[in-house]
Amino acid sequence: MSSRIGLSLAAAAALLAVAQVSAHHGAGVFEPEKKVTVEGTVTDFQFVNPHVLVYMTVKGDDGKEVQWGGELTSPNRLARDARAVKWHKSILKPGDHITITGHPARNGAPMMDILKIVDGQGTVLIDDQ
């Protein structure tokens, strides 16, 4: 009897682990069939694992400032990607003007899975569209 309980608990734990990994690597929080583009000023840039994070202030349709956030792949992948500018921890700084395009959050929050970033000089830093 106790071996069946132990086996059941082990199976349940394995299923939970698979669900967590799938949820983390899935794009469930974003809408892959939609794209949005916003333009604004970098407020924070975090070149950290597991995902590089970009935060910016964008002027909304009503003229009010909106804080947007977005995520990219890992720093290692960005630094080694031959299709993109070589990324490093100071490629973006607070005050930089950028335009980002990506898949928006399903819940309407001002965040996205970033596909493309263009800096204020028109340099494409990444384009995974």
Give a label for each model feature:
Residues S22-V36:
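Short boundary/loop segments of OB/S1/cold-shock single-stranded nucleic-acid-binding domains
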Residues H103-D128:
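OB-fold/S1-family single-stranded nucleic acid-binding modules
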Residues M1-L9:
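Bacterial N-terminal signal peptides that target proteins for export
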Residues V38-V42:
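Conserved hydrophobic positions within beta-strands
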Residues V48-V58:
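Short aromatic-glycine-enriched beta-strand elements
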Residues D81-T99:
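Short nucleic-acid-contacting surface segments enriched for D/E, G, S/T with interspersed K/R
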